[in-house]
């Protein structure tokens, strides 16, 4: 088994009406927790790392872990560069073996976003690396980047069509009302906008900010063409909450093998639920 491009996973999802979950990773324990569930449920998976993750653990180390787990669990894995902002950073990581990258130029005007994404696409496609880009801008917090409500804006369907045609991007993250992080109230998802984007854009669509979104809303986006669902915050909250509770009950505890396993098990329940919501279970052979 090996580290593969997300395009192979997303093409199957698009053809068969389900979504591939993309779970953000932060350390060896989060990788292991995710893959224990995906292996058990035989679900394809995308392991997504932000620039902050690769500062915490070097790419080469994460890549080695993922390669080893791919063999252990007998399943292909996609290791994805989430919310990266420069061609140089992506180029270095692709040369190290990564085959999936998101270039985030959503903070730029349309023309500048196109120029940046096109440069990344031209390089990545020469390396069998798929490219995701974002049009429109989600609010919330991702790594050290915070986008307030005034700076967020939704994806325009016709701009999305032009963007894909001009860049040759493999998948498109759309802004339809979700945000990074948790919600103070139920998000208002613009399903009609998503349907209009799907009518004019052929590439797989990506839903960012899926943590804390009602399951029925996520299922509806998949019915309307979303084939990759990103989950980050819910995983961290489950893990951290379980570890905090363990220490509250075991104030003298100090063995990481105990409290980390508790956190992992809590995280695994979130992973299990998201796989069921995405309809991705039993999509890879045993």
From Swiss-Prot:
It catalyses: D-tagatofuranose 1,6-bisphosphate = D-glyceraldehyde 3-phosphate + dihydroxyacetone phosphate. One of its GO terms (cellular component) is cytosol. Keywords: Lyase, Metal-binding, Zinc. Pathway: Carbohydrate metabolism; D-tagatose 6-phosphate degradation; D-glyceraldehyde 3-phosphate and glycerone phosphate from D-tagatose 6-phosphate: step 2/2. Zn(2+) binds at residues 83, 180, 208. It is an enzyme of class 4 (lyase). InterPro entries: Aldolase_TIM, Class_II_FBP_aldolase, FBA_II, TagBP_ald_KbaY, TagBP_ald_KbaY/GatY. Its EC number is 4.1.2.40. GO terms for biological process: carbohydrate metabolic process; D-tagatose 6-phosphate catabolic process. Gene3D superfamilies: Aldolase class I. Binds 1 zinc ion per subunit. Dihydroxyacetone phosphate binds at residues 181, 209-211, 230-233. It comes from the Bacteria. Its cofactor is Zn(2+). The keyword Metal-binding applies. Signal peptide: none annotated. GO terms for molecular function: tagatose-bisphosphate aldolase activity; zinc ion binding. The active site is at residue 82. Homotetramer. Forms a complex with KbaZ. Belongs to the class II fructose-bisphosphate aldolase family. TagBP aldolase KbaY subfamily. PANTHER family: D-TAGATOSE-1,6-BISPHOSPHATE ALDOLASE, D-TAGATOSE-1,6-BISPHOSPHATE ALDOLASE SUBUNIT GATY-RELATED. HAMAP family: TagBP_aldolase_KbaY. Catalytic subunit of the tagatose-1,6-bisphosphate aldolase KbaYZ, which catalyzes the reversible aldol condensation of dihydroxyacetone phosphate (DHAP or glycerone-phosphate) with glyceraldehyde 3-phosphate (G3P) to produce tagatose 1,6-bisphosphate (TBP). Requires KbaZ subunit for full activity and stability. Is involved in the catabolism of N-acetylgalactosamine and D-galactosamine. This is D-tagatose-1,6-bisphosphate aldolase subunit KbaY. It comes from Escherichia coli. The lineage of its organism: Bacteria, Pseudomonadati, Pseudomonadota, Gammaproteobacteria, Enterobacterales.
